[in-house]
A protein has these predicted regions:
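Bacterial N-terminal signal peptides
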Residues: 6-16
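Boundary at the C-terminal end of the N-terminal hydrophobic targeting segment
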Residues: 17-21, 521
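Polysaccharide-binding surfaces and accessory modules of carbohydrate-active proteins
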Residues: 21-32, 36-40, 44-248, 264
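Active-site and adjacent substrate-binding regions of carbohydrate-active enzymes
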Residues: 35, 135, 147-149, 324, ...
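Short Pro-Gly-centered flexible turn/kink motifs
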Residues: 95-100, 268-287
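Aromatic-lined carbohydrate-binding/catalytic grooves of carbohydrate-active enzymes
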Residues: 308-449, 458-459, 463
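Glycan-recognition surfaces
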Residues: 406, 411-445, 449, 490-592
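Glycan-recognition and catalytic regions of carbohydrate-active enzymes
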Residues: 589-607
């Protein structure tokens, strides 16, 4: 510890000397997290420049001349900035340019190994401020960066762009690894060398936003990424909605990394005195290749971003592949018996347990939104069937999709104005369903009531699978004002986090899996409220192993739900081996399995 303090003091003194010797420098300071360091310079023009981002051991000296504007840490639109802007606003008087000057910074220790620096910026001509937050988790060389925008102008300021961070990297070459794909082939790793210009990775889906691309990437410096050697930066955005990553290689071969919410269709009208907060972007740095960067993400997540990270995940049996929506109490009891025989610890009752009369959930066209248990399938109710599982020493969990509704439902007939849609347009369905407008307070109350009335009277339900089976195609709200329609993408997601937080705090003993038609919602914005996630509906082990490997770059194995199924008609041993690399589960009709197959599964459960 004494050596670390001595080194930090030496670097601070060294920077002070350099600042005193350079007529262009007003202040130099660093923010360091283990091996990762950000070096800042405040110029005599009062702008905040970034001199380095990367290896903490690398000394960065201020330039002999005033840096050009492309080195501004959070470049605002207009007034001489020619690169991709991080912040763009229209002020109340119509001025579309913003100037940001440094007014100070402070650093505080939040907990052992966690420090936070806040850098204060202000427009010299307007009461418009941006505060940059940099939280350092020093044990894992991790930085978490976000910012807040506030103003006191006499009216609304329109925010057009609002990046979470925009650091600049300097290297000879940049190799980008992204994790893209589509339904049943999610998180497929693709690596390419970046050339001069702007490369965009994004999602425009709103919810189930990560079906085609997860909000994470790896940047290898000076060559393709290797497992155990070479410099890499790994990053992940804590946001479950539309996002955008812009990789801007300029004429001097510098790379700016603009990351955050997708600004498309999302301009935000910020009221006087209001605060706009961006999601956080996580960065870690490694000189030992992407393997060490991945392990740092895992260690950080286990300590900071996963619910009950050290708690054992139950081996569960899911009924979906065995029954779909066609089951009754006797069939479920047969499945409970199968779960007990192989040693499964929990039975998860999937879709199909709710809806009555003409809206009975007998297929995916009916009943979504009507969350009363089916009197046809479960005449004795949820409490009875949960206790039947417990009699067999098997826990009981349930499937919920609180954000969705079928047009063929009682809820839709009563509240057609509750859905996300656009006026004068034919509704576009996804999986025969619509999305409830979570910006609307009545919907927020309704969705909480779904969770509360399902779980509170039924304390034997100890697990929830929270699903979300479509994305937004017609962004519009009958609740939001016409001028604020573009708020939908952002306000929906913040409301969703509030609901998830209420669920996690209200039912601390109920474990939860995050699902969205596969991996449509996998990020560290949502994971603090969940124990695991469903990475894909592709459970063919040959395809699944690639998907799980992709997610493992950022997420620990105990968060990646992995089930044994018949998909692909592979050898059962292969399906078991692949599933054992994650949070193990079973999705089979065990009563139709052979004795040898049940024995194989039972042996796997014991592991």
């Amino acid at each position: 510890m004494k050596n670390i303090l001595t080194t930090c003091l030496f670097l601070c003194l060294l920077l002070t000397v350099h600042a005193a010797d350079n007529p262009n420098v007003k202040k130099l300071f660093t923010v360091t997290s283990g091996e990762l360091k950000l070096t800042f310079m405040v110029g005599t023009d009062n702008r905040l420049y970034q001199l380095g981002f990367g290896d903490a051991a690398r000394e960065v000296e201020p330039p002999a001349k005033m840096p050009s504007r492309e080195w501004e840490f959070l470049p605002p639109y207009g007034n001489g900035v020619l690169t991709e802007p991080a912040i763009q606003a229209t002020h109340v008087d119509g001025n579309t340019s913003t100037e940001l000057h440094y007014t100070g910074h402070r650093t505080e220790t939040l907990a052992p190994g966690i420090e936070q620096t806040v850098i204060l910026l202000k427009d010299p001509a307007y009461p418009f401020t941006v505060d940059i937050y940099i939280k350092c988790y020093t044990d894992n060389s991790m930085m978490e960066i976000w910012n807040t925008v506030t103003h006191n102008e006499k009216g609304k300021v329109i925010l057009h762009r609002f990046a979470s961070a925009a650091p600049v990297v300097k290297a000879k070459e940049y190799w980008l690894s992204q994790f893209s794909g589509n339904y049943k082939r999610e998180a497929t790793l693709n690596e390419e060398r970046l050339s001069e210009g702007v490369k965009i990775l994004d999602s425009k889906l709103g919810i189930r936003a990560h079906q085609m691309r997860i909000p994470s990437f790896i940047l290898s410096l000076n060559g393709p990424a290797k497992e155990n050697e070479g410099e890499v930066l790994a990053a992940s955005l804590r946001w479950s909605s539309s996002f955008q990553f812009a990789f801007d290689v300029d004429w001097n071969k510098n790379l700016r990394l603009l990351t955050g919410m997708n600004p498309l269709g999302s301009q935000y009208n910020l009221e006087r005195g209001g605060t706009f907060t961006t999601p956080a972007i996580l960065y870690t740095y490694s000189k030992q290749g992407k393997g060490e960067a991945s392990r740092r993400f895992h260690r950080w997540a286990m300590a900071n971003a996963i619910r009950d990270a050290e708690k054992d995940r139950p081996v569960l049996l899911n009924n979906w592949e065995a029954t779909h929506c066609d089951f009754d109490e006797d069939r479920l009891k047969q499945l409970f018996d199968g779960a007990r025989q192989v040693g499964a610890e929990l039975f998860l009752l999937d879709d199909g347990w709710f809806g009555n009369g003409p809206y009975s959930r007998d297929d995916d066209k009916h009943g979504l939104g009507d969350w009363d248990p089916s009197t046809k399938k479960l005449p004795k109710g949820l409490s009875y069937i949960a206790k039947e599982a417990l009699k067999r020493k098997v826990g009981f969990g349930i499937w919920l999709e609180p954000e969705m509704v079928n047009p063929q439902s009682e809820l839709y007939q009563k509240h057609p104005d509750w859905i996300i849609t656009q006026p004068k347009r034919e509704p576009i369905l996804g999986r025969h369903q619509e999305i409830l407008d979570l910006t609307r307070p009545e919907v927020q109350a309704f969705e909480w009531d779904i969770i509360d009335k399902t779980l509170r009277p039924n304390p034997d339900i100890t697990y929830v699978k929270w699903d979300c089976n479509r994305y937004i195609t017609q962004p519009g709200s009958s609740y939001l004002q016409p001028a604020d329609q573009s708020h939908l993408w952002i306000d929906y997601n913040w409301a969703l986090y509030r609901l998830m937080d209420r669920f996690a705090k209200g039912f601390p003993n109920v474990m939860a899996m995050l699902c969205a038609g596969g991996s449509g919602r996998v990020d560290y914005g949502a994971m603090p409220y969940f124990h695991s996630f469903w990475p894909s509906d592709n459970t063919d082990p040959l395809g699944r192993i690639k998907i799980q490997w992709g997610f493992s770059h950022f997420f620990p194995a105990n968060t990646i739900s992995a089930h044994v199924t018949r998909m692909g008609k592979r050898h059962l041993k292969m399906a078991i081996d692949v599933a054992l690399s994650g949070a193990f589960g079973i999705d089979l009709a065990l009563d139709k399995a052979t004795a040898e197959e049940r024995a194989q599964i039972a042996d796997a459960v014991k592991l």
